[in-house]
């Protein structure tokens, strides 16, 4: 029994030793982790703070760029609106100018047509007068020739001349 008891004590001691060893290892690990956390905390906190600052700076820059972009967008929209208004005004003015030009061209064409018609009427009237004069002259010439022929048969040369002169004078006065 003694051997059993020694065995038990030995096994108990070994198990206590292992248990103590495990406990001390656990304690050592906890101490190491605590030291790492304690010492690394500053570095981690510093890194995290640096990252936080970088992120905040990036956010501020992005917000600044966003506000600038929004301002440029608002300016561009304003310019587009102004341009559309100007285009609308120019279209309206172009329509008015086109109508005025059209009206002017139509009026000029009417005046030219009226002038051509008037000139044509004048030419026709002048031509009529000229033709009438030619017809009268032809009639007079024919009448004179017939009269001469009749008179030549019946009258002497002096009388014929006197009558012819009287008739020519008479006809010239009546025309």
From Swiss-Prot:
**Which cysteines are disulphide-bonded?**
none
Where in or outside the cell?
Plastid, Chloroplast thylakoid membrane
Q: How does it sit in the membrane?
A: Single-pass membrane protein
The alphabetized UniProt keywords are: ATP synthesis, ATP-binding, CF(0), Chloroplast, Hydrogen ion transport, Ion transport, Membrane, Nucleotide-binding, Plastid, Thylakoid, Transmembrane, Transmembrane helix, Transport
Function per UniProt: F(1)F(0) ATP synthase produces ATP from ADP in the presence of a proton or sodium gradient. F-type ATPases consist of two structural domains, F(1) containing the extramembraneous catalytic core and F(0) containing the membrane proton channel, linked together by a central stalk and a peripheral stalk. During catalysis, ATP synthesis in the catalytic domain of F(1) is coupled via a rotary mechanism of the central stalk subunits to proton translocation. Component of the F(0) channel, it forms part of the peripheral stalk, linking F(1) to F(0).
The family line of this record is: Belongs to the ATPase B chain family.
Q: Which Pfam families would you find in this protein's record?
A: ATP-synt_B
Write out the GO cellular component annotations: chloroplast thylakoid membrane; proton-transporting ATP synthase complex
InterPro entries found in the cross-reference section: ATP_synth_b/b'su_bac/chlpt
Residue ranges crossing the lipid bilayer per the database entry: 21-40
On subunit structure and binding partners, the annotation says: F-type ATPases have 2 components, F(1) - the catalytic core - and F(0) - the membrane proton channel. F(1) has five subunits: alpha(3), beta(3), gamma(1), delta(1), epsilon(1). F(0) has four main subunits: a(1), b(1), b'(1) and c(10-14). The alpha and beta chains form an alternating ring which encloses part of the gamma chain. F(1) is attached to F(0) by a central stalk formed by the gamma and epsilon chains, while a peripheral stalk is formed by the delta, b and b' chains.
Q: Which superkingdom?
A: Eukaryota
Protein name per the record: ATP synthase subunit b, chloroplastic
GO MF terms held by the record: ATP binding; proton-transporting ATP synthase activity, rotational mechanism
Other comment? In plastids the F-type ATPase is also known as CF(1)CF(0).
């Amino acid at each position: 029994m003694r051997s059993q008891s020694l065995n038990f004590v030995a096994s108990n001691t070994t198990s206590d030793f292992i248990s103590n060893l495990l406990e001390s290892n656990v304690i050592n690990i906890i101490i190491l982790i605590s030291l790492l956390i304690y010492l690394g905390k500053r570095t981690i906190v510093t890194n995290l703070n640096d990252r936080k600052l970088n992120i905040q700076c990036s956010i501020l820059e992005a917000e600044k760029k966003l506000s600038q972009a929004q301002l440029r967008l608002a300016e561009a929209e304003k310019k587009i609106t102004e341009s559309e208004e100007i285009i609308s005004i120019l279209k309206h003015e172009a329509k008015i100018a086109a109508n005025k030009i059209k009206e002017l061209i139509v009026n000029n064409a009417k005046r030219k047509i009226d002038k051509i018609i008037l000139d044509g009427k004048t030419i026709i009237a002048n031509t009529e007068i000229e033709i009438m004069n030619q017809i009268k002259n032809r009639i007079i010439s024919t009448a004179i020739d017939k009269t001469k022929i009749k008179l030549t048969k019946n009258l002497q040369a002096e009388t014929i001349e006197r009558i012819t002169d009287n008739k020519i004078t008479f006809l010239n006065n009546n025309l």
